[in-house]
Amino acid sequence: IGENPKGDQEEGSSDGSIEILGQDIRQFKDWSSISYVPQNGMGGWKDFPASVEEIVRANLYKQIGLFRFAGKKERQQVRAALAQVGMEEYQNRLIGRLSGGQQQRVLLARALVNEPKLLILDEPTSALDEKNASHFYRLLKKINAEKRITVLMVTHDLKRASSYADDIWVLEDGKVKQEAGKGDGQA
């Protein structure tokens, strides 16, 4: 149940279906196979006292156990995720000492450390300059190709997205207004 743009209560659609990784969402149980990168997720954490390594490792607490120390396997997973995004040499630096682009790459590493099948990103480049935004998109395309991770991103930057995405859906008022794919030359 939620509110529509007019402020009226709605229960949602009763027709159609939603599948995640080929499974009906109502029966889906493998939530650890999905990772999320928020919009400008580290904004305002300038004095947050955690290192890059600690931020990434936090996504492994389900695997490690709360209040337990990471073992060799988990430390290797963290290093591998940081290497994927080009941030391995920053692992001991405090997260608040990094640029916005570097922080977003750390959040991407945090999402990748679990080796997800689906990566969901919410406007991940909204706070980045042109150079860092382009680098971030190239990085996502590389990860998608090399790791075979499905990437689902919300963005208002259709021009840039169309250069990297295989498929694009334009939503308006909660409905698909336009759909385009690489095969039809419109993405």
Residue ranges: model-predicted function:
Residues 155-156:
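H-loop/switch region of ABC-family ATPase nucleotide-binding domains
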Residues 57, 71-90:
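Conserved ABC ATPase "signature" region
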Residues 168-181:
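H-loop (His-switch) and adjacent beta-strand-loop-beta switch element
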Residues 119-122:
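Catalytic Walker B motif of ABC-type/P-loop ATPase nucleotide-binding domains
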Residues 94-98:
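Conserved ABC ATPase signature
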Residues 13-30:
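Conserved ABC transporter NBD signature motif
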Residues 115:
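Conserved catalytic motifs of ABC-family nucleotide-binding domains
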